[in-house]
């Protein structure tokens, strides 16, 4: 069957909660209000809605001995849906994927055409799908979103994660993670929580688990590591192969602290280009490394066989809250220098890691030409070939 029908009651509740949250400038004010306990229960019910779908026409079966082709992509909400669908369906390096994990996936947002992005993509590709919400969006979008928005308001107003699979998904669960909800509410007008989506894939020879997680971007390396450790603790009991993907926001900087802007300015402005590139493209190594990789290694996960350390995102200072917080004259003065920094600041944020797979002959690649302004997404997709152990 195609994606489940849109639920009018869910849409009404989303609009009611958006209206209820709108008067509050801070999360503390919202939480202090007498209505918050009931609003929190309603929000929890809304965000517990996990959508699953079976395709109208399943993708052709593949030889079970063939390597597993895995694609991960942060699709920037699905704003440029047609370009994303075309790439996943026809691009030489992306088509015929066995598993596709997606971050930043809308349900009923004006910026992405008011679509069920995951459900429509999965049905077009002949794949099974699971989608889970992270946040209720209170606006029609930010930054470049309004360039692609349809003229009407949002419907469900939800934003989340998805797993698409050639084989049925026999179980899906959400793993709650610690997160900077205050920052997201006050800066981006999003209300919700961070979760990881964990799915059991019914491969005909060797069933395996696929998890995807979008880690936070506004805080420190330690905070991202704490999020990852919670997920890894949940996955520790899995005895079969585990695939773990996501936009882990491994930019190597500690944001949200008093001196974070100055601490970042030194490397971005003064380091030689080669040294800066090594830091930003190899965030799993060196003194500024993201601590989440230490946690992954301790939990038995590998990522080096499945990636190439190429950039997956170009830094865009126009989207950073720290830049918007500058006084106008200072921001104008800094703009020329920031443009220079953007050109040399390419980030490796997206990853495929695995435990319990045979890494012999594994490969990973970042797919060029699909990311950047006006293209399918702001992130590049990544693809890996893995070998399942015999059943």
Model-derived regions, located:
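Metal-dependent phosphoester-hydrolase catalytic domains
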Residues: 1-55, 174, 221, 235-243, ...
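Stable alpha-helical elements in mature extracytoplasmic
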Residues: 80, 84, 114-117, 121, ...
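Active-site beta-strand/loop signature of hydrolases that rely on acidic residues for catalysis
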Residues: 69-74, 88-114, 132-134, 164, ...
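Alpha-helical structural signal in soluble globular domains
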Residues: 91, 119-128, 234, 291, ...
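C-terminal or late-domain output modules
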Residues: 64-65, 82-90, 94-97, 111-126, ...
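Active-site-proximal beta-strand elements of phosphoester/diester hydrolases
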Residues: 65-77, 173-175, 207-217
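Structured beta-strand-rich core segments of catalytic domains in phosphoester-bond hydrolases
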Residues: 3-62, 105-207
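Active-site environment of divalent metal-dependent phosphoester hydrolases
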Residues: 78-80, 107-110, 137-140, 182, ...
